[in-house]
Structures are given as structure tokens and as C-alpha cells.
Amino acid sequence: MTDSSPSQHLFADVLARVHRACAALAEEGALPSGLDLARIVVEPPRDASHGDMATNAAMVLAKDAKAKPRDLAERIVTKLRADDLIESADIAGPGFINLTLKLPVWADVLRDVLRDGEGYGRSAIGAGEKVNVEYVSANPTGPMHVGHCRGAVFGDALASLLSFAGYDVTREYYINDAGSQVDVLARSAFLRYREALGEDIGEIPDGLYPGDYLKPVGQALAAGHGDSLVKAPEAEWLGLVRAKAIGMMMEMIRGDLAALNIRHDVFFSERSLIDGSADRVAETIGFLREKGDVYEGRLPPPKGAPVEDYEDREQTLFRATAYGDDVDRPLKKSDGGYTYFASDIAYHKTKFDRGFHNMVDVWGADHGGYIKRVQAAIKAVTSGKGTLDVKIVQLVKLLRNGEPVKMSKRAGDFVTLREVVEEVGSDAVRFMMLFRKNDAVLDFDLARVIEQSKDNPVFYVQYGHARGFSIFRNAREVFPDLPEADAERRQFLGTADLERLSDPAELGLLRKLALYPRTVEAAAAAHEPHRIAFYLYDLASEFHALWTKGRDLPHLRFIINNDAQITRARLALVQGVVAVLASGLTVLGVHAPTEMR
């Protein structure tokens, strides 16, 4: 039986005890030896009145044990009731086991938080494994718009979450600077260059980028080249103008991302795949051809819905169907150039060659149909050693008081990311972009996200952190020597009699703190940072509820002027809450204010 785990927290501890109970039964012959215990989970019960934790151990082992789940549960419960951590163990329904832990356990949880501070919840489950998270990767053809915003925030938060869970993360941006869209960018910039020289260019022709953001590119070209390019043939100026425009657009994009506290470690140019000393796309196609995964052939006409890249001709094809895709995929266009898919295969091969066997790509909703072919390609180029998880982020509907927001004049046909950040701040944007699962459409209301109410999640969570520090400031009437510095304050409060925290509301907060490390690990494993946002809102809600309770019931107030012991214990609880709120907000890239203005 296997029960090894890098997890070090209360839920992992209880899971290990369940494993040991099963191992003891196996030694006694009451369970077969060699059972896989990986399917056993220990989680919070759906109904808090049923206990502190629940396990499915009997349910998942019953078949292999050739026993009824309830009968097996009885045997497991007998072992668990003898455990020094467990107050009671009861069987529910068809064989679930509900566990209630002894009260001193919760004081120990708080001691862990006070010891680790904002580091509480950090995990080693990643074991230093290298992970490449690619996100944003917007075409370098203009400023970031609100549609890019969600993927940028999601990818950045996921990278932070994976780092917090012990992975060695590289954050990557793939610059799409080799497709036809950058030639359109160059022609659009050339028009602005002529405008900068004094020419009346009139209306921007259809097919070119109309936004005013290209005017500075035109002005820079005019300043650097005068009118020397005006009469030159396109073949002479296209590459020069394209490089200048891409460079200035990427500078703009980096600024947009910085405004939202988005960072990347690597900016990888698509053009570098073919413009360097070697044509890496050709090398990749050759590599796959040697494996028998590339051939010259003709695709049959598509059945039902048309395939967007279908052409009835002899062409170079990747044998995608051998790796789970629906059809084989073209690697070259009719003009002899590479398809975007061919470049994508080569790009992902470079990731694998750089040591990334674990890859995550964050894509927009319009790329959903592209997943199978890229995953098939990765299986082929890595001989099954590489994995790719594609996270699709759905659309963002930008509203103000429930009404759609008008488009940006500067950008031409969209609302820029910078405009949104300047209006509501990066914290509101980041938290709200994560307060819904990535594959669900998100309504982002500019009016709602600046409201100071429970209905505004980012305010409610940040206010929870600020409220904790307000309590600390007020507590100096009882403890004038309560330290300002975090580490010293945690040490000061760590000497409190934490067992005095026995009210159901206080114990509820302690249980919620105990859940944080498990939430971190589950969110990291599922690549779902929204779980952290949901957790923080729940924690803040319970904290605010306890504060409100104390306003109505004086004996539950955090500060009791004539009882220094209970005040110190409750301040320790407040310290635990603000530490975890700060930890989670940091993972999400959101500030944890000590006061709200």
C-alpha cells in the first residue's frame, strides 16, 4: 500500500491516518494487501454538522476488498476511533465516514499559521518539476484589449499558484510575429508614416488597422528615415517597417501588462523559428517524417461541417489521427509556406527541448477546436513524454451598470486593457477576472467592481484584511506593546492560550484556515486559480460574520478590555486570518491593504 505524500497539513495528516488504518486492516487480513489507496480522499463534509472531515475510503476500496461499503466502513472506523487525533468517527449513507477531530487540533492549526505567516499553505507537491505556462501571446498588432485581460490574469495567477505549490515555473509569451497579420501591421504603419510626413491619407482602407495607436510608429519612421521610404517599392520597406512596428507594439503591450502586474520570464519570437541559423520548422517536420508521422497525401473531403484548412490537393500532412485527432493536418500551404500549425508544433518542441515536459497553454475561446491537434502533435514530437494542458478562457462582457460599454476611439474597435485598469485599478480587474471559472463567460461591470459592499468580492476580501489591521490598532489599548512588524506580532501572539477559542464561530474560522493548504494543492493540481478566489471570499465572509456577531454579543468581541487572555487568543485568530488572506491575495497578484480609503 502506498501513502507517501509531500503534503504537510492537517488534511494530509488525517489522510495518512486513514491510510494507516487501512494498512493495519491489511496486516490483520481484513483487507487484501497491495490495495491502491490513491483514490481515497479526505475533504470537508458537505454539511458542517456532520463533523470536521469526511472520507470515501470504504466506498472506493469495497469492490477490491469484496465487501459491502458499510461493512468495510465499520472496520475502518474501529481503527480510526483509536487514533489520538480523532474525537469520533461515524458512518453515513452507503458507507461514507465522517470524522470529528479533538479540539486541541484547531489550536495547533493556528500555531502553524502563526509560525509560517504568509508562507502558510505553501506546498511541495510540485517537487521542483519544471512547468512552462504560456499566456497572453497576443498578436503584436496593437494595444491589449479587455478580451486579452482575462487570459493574462488567469495565466499569471496560475503561474504564481504553481510556484506556491512547489513547481519550477517559467512564464512565457509567444510573439506571433511571422504571420500575415504583421505584414498588415506594417502596411498600416506605413500609411501612418506617410501621414506623419504631411500627406492626407483620408479614411483607413478596409483590411488595415485603423487605431490611432499606430500614429507614433509613423512619426518614429518619419523621424528616422525622412521621406526616403515613400517612393521605395514595398519589398524594400516592408521588413524594416514591420520590425519597427512590432518592436513598438511589443513595448506598448509590455506596458499594458505591467499596468496589470502581469510578468513573463520569456518572450519567444515565432519568426526566430525560421529566421535563425536553422529552420526549426523544417527540422521538426523532418523529425516527424523520420518517425513516419509526416507524409505526402490527399485529405478526403470533410463530412458534415467544413474543416477550415481543407484543400483538395496533394500536400504535406501530419498523421494526427494516430494520436487521437479527428483528421490528419496540413503542414504547408498551397504557396509553399508553413501553416500556423506547423510553426506551433516546432514551437512546442522547443519547449520540450528546453526541459519542459509539463506545459500549460492559456488560449481564448475561439481556439477550442485547435486543442486536439496540438496535443496530438506534442505526443508525437515528445514520444509521449510531454503533456499539454490547454486552459480555455471564455469571453468577457464589459458592462457599466448592466449596459454594454462603448468601444475605444483610440483603439478603433475595442476597449483597451489600459483604459479599464486606469478606471477601476489592477486589483479589481485581477480579482474579478478570477472570481469565475475560466471556461464560463464573465460579466465585468465597471460600476460594480468599485462598490464598497459585500456584493463586490474584491472589496469584501480586501476589507477583511484591512479590518484585521484595524482590530490590531484598536487592540493597543489593551496591549500597548503589540508589535507592528508581522514576524514580531506573530511571535507575540503565539504565546496566547489558543485553546480558549471554543465558540462555534471561532472554530469555524479555524477550520477554514486548516482548509487553505488543501485548497492550494487542489487548485494547483486542477490548474484552477479561481478556487483560491472563492476560498478567500468564504474566509472573509466568515471573518466579517464573527466581527458582526461581536457587535451584537459583547462577549464575542475580539477585544475584551477586562480579559487580556481571551483578547490575546482572538488577536491570534485575527492574525491567522490576515496572514491567509494576504497569502491568497499575493498568489492572485492582488494587494492586501492594511486600511481602506
UniProtKB/Swiss-Prot annotation:
Catalytic activity: tRNA(Arg) + L-arginine + ATP = L-arginyl-tRNA(Arg) + AMP + diphosphate
InterPro entries: aa-tRNA-synth_I_CS, Arg-tRNA-ligase, Arg-tRNA-synth_N, Arg-tRNA-synth_N_sf, ArgRS_core, DALR_anticod-bd, Rossmann-like_a/b/a_fold, tRNAsynth_Ia_anticodon-bd
Keywords attached to this entry: Aminoacyl-tRNA synthetase, ATP-binding, Cytoplasm, Ligase, Nucleotide-binding, Protein biosynthesis
GO cellular component: a single term: cytoplasm
Enzyme class: ligase
GO MF terms, alphabetically ordered: arginine-tRNA ligase activity; ATP binding
Pfam families attached to this UniProt entry: Arg_tRNA_synt_N, DALR_1, tRNA-synt_1d
Highest taxon of source: Bacteria
GO BP terms, alphabetized: arginyl-tRNA aminoacylation
Record's subunit section: Monomer.
Record-stated family: Belongs to the class-I aminoacyl-tRNA synthetase family.
Full protein name: Arginine--tRNA ligase
Gene name as annotated: argS
